[in-house]
């Protein structure tokens, strides 16, 4: 049985690990368009706030360690662009090389994550306005806060990540609204 999983952070990585426990002979390929898999999303604000001091502590698994533990082939920087459900095939873009190829599957699991909502407000694209969804966003926010005298911050969103972001900006001494 050939499983293809789209998305390699929380849901996709958990699905891959569970599949391996259920079927030791399955071929499992996990595609992640980002650079990292299986990282602690809820830890991102705590890295920005300095509670987690070492960036590497955000990562639960690497593609190599995930393969060694679960025999799951992980392809980072690989974006699934098209699904042909009838032919049971996905079209994948290798973001490093720019090449496109197809991968066949017997079963497909979709766990691509979410995109932050950026309301159509004037100035939303200005410098110093961020969204927080992944490690790259975290690096941008931390670099900005480390290199500037940030006088205040506004956090829009009161989910777990928004609340933790407010907590950790406050921890850095930045007044938060």
PLM-predicted stretches and their roles:
Residues 14-15, 140, 144, 165:
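Residues within well-formed alpha-helices
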């Amino acid at each position: 049985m050939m499983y293809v999983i789209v998305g390699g952070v929380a849901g996709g990585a958990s699905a891959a690990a569970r599949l391996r426990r259920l079927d030791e002979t399955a071929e499992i390929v996990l595609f992640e368009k980002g650079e990292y898999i299986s990282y602690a999303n809820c830890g991102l604000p705590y890295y920005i706030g300095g509670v987690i001091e070492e960036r590497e502590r955000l990562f639960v698994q690497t593609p190599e360690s995930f393969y060694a533990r679960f025999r799951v082939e992980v392809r980072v920087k690989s974006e699934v662009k098209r699904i042909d459900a009838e032919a049971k095939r996905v079209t994948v873009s290798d973001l490093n090389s720019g090449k496109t190829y197809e991968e066949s599957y017997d079963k497909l699991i979709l766990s691509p994550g979410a995109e932050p909502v950026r309301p159509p407000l004037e100035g939303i694209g200005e410098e110093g306005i961020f969204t927080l969804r992944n490690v790259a966003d975290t690096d941008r926010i931390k670099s900005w806060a480390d290199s500037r005298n940030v006088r205040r911050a506004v956090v829009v969103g009161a989910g777990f990540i928004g609340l933790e972001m407010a907590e950790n900006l406050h921890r850095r001494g930045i007044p938060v609204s």
